[in-house]
UniProtKB/Swiss-Prot annotation:
Gene label: erpA
Family listed: Belongs to the HesB/IscA family.
Record keywords, A-Z: Iron, Iron-sulfur, Metal-binding
Single Gene Ontology BP annotation: iron-sulfur cluster assembly
Residues where iron-sulfur cluster binds: 44, 108, 110
Gene3D superfamilies with a match to the protein in the record: HesB-like domain
Role: Required for insertion of 4Fe-4S clusters.
Co-factor remark: Binds 1 iron-sulfur cluster per subunit.
Cofactor dependence: iron-sulfur cluster
Pfam families assigned to the protein according to its UniProt record, in alphabetical order: Fe-S_biosyn
Keyword Metal-binding set for record: yes
NCBIfam families xref list: iron-sulfur cluster assembly accessory protein, PRK13623.1
Protein name as annotated: Putative iron-sulfur cluster insertion protein ErpA
Amino acid sequence: MNATTEMESPLVFTDSAASKVKSLIDEEGNPDLKLRVFVSGGGCSGFQYGFTFDEAQNADDTVMVKNGVTLLVDSMSFQYLVGAEIDYSEGLEGAQFVIKNPNATTTCGCGSSFSA
C-alpha cells in the first residue's frame, strides 16, 4: 500500500526539518532525492533511528510531502514511528535531525537509540 499524505498524518514532519532537507537536496543538485527515515536494530537501547537520501520509492513506503520535500518510511519502521515528530534542531549541542517518539519507553543520551 502506498499512502501519500499532506495533512492529518500519523507522523509530524516539521517545517524546520523539511527546510533543512530541501537545502541539503539543493546542495546535492539532485531533485529526485527523498529523505528516508528508518528504524533498525542496534544502538544502546535496542533500536536506532537512521536517515538517508533515496531516489527510489518502494511500494510499501508511507510517503509524506512537506514544502516540496518527500519523506519516506518503510512499513516495518512505520510501526515504531506512529505519532512521532521528525524535526531539525540547532542548539548548543550542534545541529541535528531529532525524532520525538511517544512510542519510545526509554531513550539513550545520544538521542538516536530507543526501546519500545
